[in-house]
């Protein structure tokens, strides 16, 4: 069975973490003195193992970075202040903003911390120390507040200029910034979680907050529509903000953001109810035309219970919803079908891989589960001496004091290429726990030599135990049996793409899962990937002895092209029909030969 092999890297110096000396798939940082007096009898052996794999055991404290002291300061900050935003500028730099105005920049090298910069330039200079949300760009910062009907606009008068933006971290004081405030409509004298979103052109901003029931609305002689609105459209131009339009959504919004393909479309997910009070979710499209925002499309998705989390794929053609009864709902726009699966945990967090092949579901209790985009579950395990994949990964067992998982996000470029030849590899999942620690989950996509008959170099996706290598220090008595993992399937480029997953399913003989994933792919937008995947499935089945089950699988595979749920574009049909007709002919001859043999 296919499964994902991972490593957990926690960026923490605290001794309250419970990581054993035989947990070779889990790492944290240590002080030098901990090696001298430790409850773990073989911690030194694990140190040698980590350093042999280029993982730092202790952090350097050289000037000017003083990484060890900076990380200790960050961990103390997370204990005492609320982190309101974490944003990845690129694959190497993460920015954290705290409610007090402290801005922290993290620089990575692989799964390891390379630099921590703590910037207190804004502390004491804002009208409130209860920041609700923020937008961070290279030219400006926009802040919203929990108890203020104002937005803070911080304009940089000096452009961020760096020949190596991935490694250089500048403080705000070096950018000569100017602070201004703008009044916005909304509920007064009420603590409100005002959220922000910006489009890719950076000329329009959305500010939104939850709806409040009419009977809870503060008394006023006349409440204008503007005051009752919960979604504001603001324009940004020439260093200024301006409220352009406002609207009150029909239902309570769960998520609001601008479209990635259409910068003047706003996509929302709103929790609604049907005629019989059954729970539903509305996927709405708003358009910004002539400085006005209006709803142009609503898709109603039936649910078994109230939605508590949601996520869209990068291509925005699939919407995933997590519900109170632990069900996970996937709505496919191009097929207009709804899939459902019961998760092993409460889906408080959902994150889709940028390649669009898998999605991760997490609970606040520190659990993680993986599904592919057909909602087939995929087992997972941390690197260990023994093969023991499970349905979920438990993080809280490493904490002496339970810590809530509040964010998980793939570390990826802001614009992820969907082209098959792209070399962008996304194998790090950022994890943030309430009050700390921070860390990443590394998906082990190891480089492998490709056989001569294959045309590309790549990575193994999933692994099986074959044999073990032994490693120990010269004076130690304990040995670490490092597993050598042998793939049953195809070598991939480690991008966790749908093609990678389907090839792995084939070589683990999970044909139904491969066909289901192929059925979830859109021939009109992913024609080449669909053709490669279908060819692999059909070729594999045609090499097997024909049975009623394999016959049905061949029909289902070819049916993704010949009998799709939604009609294919004429250009798609013309491009692939001749090649696919050859597979259909081979299938017919396969049936004919089997029929003659039986008679």
Please annotate each region the language model reported:
Residues 423-426, 437, 444-447:
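Intrinsically disordered, low-complexity linkers and terminal regions
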Residues 485-599:
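Non-catalytic amphipathic alpha-helical adaptor/oligomerization segments
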Residues 418-430:
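Eukaryote-biased detector of low-complexity, proline/serine/threonine-rich segments
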Residues 1-418, 441-472, 477-493, 497:
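WD40-like beta-propeller blades
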């Amino acid at each position: 069975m296919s499964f994902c092999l991972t490593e957990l890297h926690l960026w923490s110096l605290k001794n309250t973490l419970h990581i054993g000396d035989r947990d070779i798939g889990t790492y944290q940082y240590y002080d030098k003195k901990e090696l001298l007096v430790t409850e773990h009898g073989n911690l030194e052996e694990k140190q040698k193992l980590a350093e042999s794999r280029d993982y730092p055991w202790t952090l350097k404290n050289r000037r000017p970075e003083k990484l060890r002291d900076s990380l200790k300061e960050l961990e103390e900050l997370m204990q005492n202040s609320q982190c309101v935003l974490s944003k990845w500028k690129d694959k190497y730099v993460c920015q954290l903003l705290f409610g007090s105005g402290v801005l922290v920049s993290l620089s990575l090298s692989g799964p390891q911390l390379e630099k921590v910069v703590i910037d207190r330039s804004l502390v004491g200079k804002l009208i409130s120390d209860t920041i609700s949300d923020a937008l961070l760009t290279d030219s400006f910062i926009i802040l919203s507040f929990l108890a203020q009907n104002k937005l803070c606009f911080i304009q940089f008068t000096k452009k961020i200029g760096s020949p190596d933006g991935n490694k250089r971290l500048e403080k705000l004081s070096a950018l000569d910034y100017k602070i201004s405030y703008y009044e916005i409509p909304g509920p007064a004298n009420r603590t409100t979680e005002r959220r922000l979103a910006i489009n890719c052109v950076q000329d329009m901003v959305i500010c939104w907050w939850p709806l409040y029931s009419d009977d809870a609305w503060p008394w006023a002689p006349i409440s204008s529509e503007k005051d009752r609105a919960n979604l504001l459209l603001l324009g940004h131009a020439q260093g200024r903000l301006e409220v352009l339009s406002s609207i009150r959504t029909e239902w309570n919004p769960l998520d609001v953001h601008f479209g990635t393909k259409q910068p003047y479309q706003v996509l929302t997910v709103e929790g609604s109810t049907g005629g019989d009070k059954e729970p539903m979710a509305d996927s709405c499209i708003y358009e910004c035309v002539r400085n006005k925002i209006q709803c142009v499309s609503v898709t109603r998705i039936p649910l078994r219970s109230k939605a508590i989390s949601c996520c869209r794929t990068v291509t925005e053609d699939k919407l995933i919803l997590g519900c109170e009864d632990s069900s996970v709902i996937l709505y496919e726009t191009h097929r207009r079908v709804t899939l459902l699966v019961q998760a092993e945990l409460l889906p408080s967090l959902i994150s889709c891989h940028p390649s669009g092949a898998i999605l991760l579901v997490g609970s606040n209790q520190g659990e993680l589960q993986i599904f592919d985009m057909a909602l087939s579950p995929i087992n997972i395990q941390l690197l260990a001496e023994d093969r023991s994949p499970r349905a979920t990964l438990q993080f809280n067992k490493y904490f002496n004091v339970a810590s809530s998982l509040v964010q998980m996000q793939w570390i990826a470029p802001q614009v992820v290429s969907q082209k098959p030849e792209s070399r962008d590899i996304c194998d790090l999942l950022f994890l943030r726990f309430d009050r700390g620690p921070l860390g990443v989950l590394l998906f082990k996509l190891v480089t492998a030599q490709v056989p001569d008959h294959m045309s590309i170099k790549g990575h193994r996706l999933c692994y099986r135990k074959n044999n073990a290598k032994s490693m120990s220090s010269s004076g130690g008595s304990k040995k670490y049996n490092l597993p050598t993992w042998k793939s049953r399937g195809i070598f991939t480029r480690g991008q966790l793409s749908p093609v990678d997953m389907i090839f792995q399913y084939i070589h683990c003989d999970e044909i139904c899962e491969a066909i289901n994933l192929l059925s979830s792919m859109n021939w009109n937008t992913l024609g080449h990937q669909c053709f490669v995947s279908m060819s692999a499935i059909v070729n594999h089945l045609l090499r097997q002895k024909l049975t009623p089950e394999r016959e049905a699988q061949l029909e289902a595979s070819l049916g993704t092209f010949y009998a799709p749920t939604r009609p294919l574009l004429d250009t798609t049909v013309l491009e692939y029909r001749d090649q696919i007709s050859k597979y259909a002919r081979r299938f017919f001859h396969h049936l004919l030969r089997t029929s003659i043999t039986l008679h």
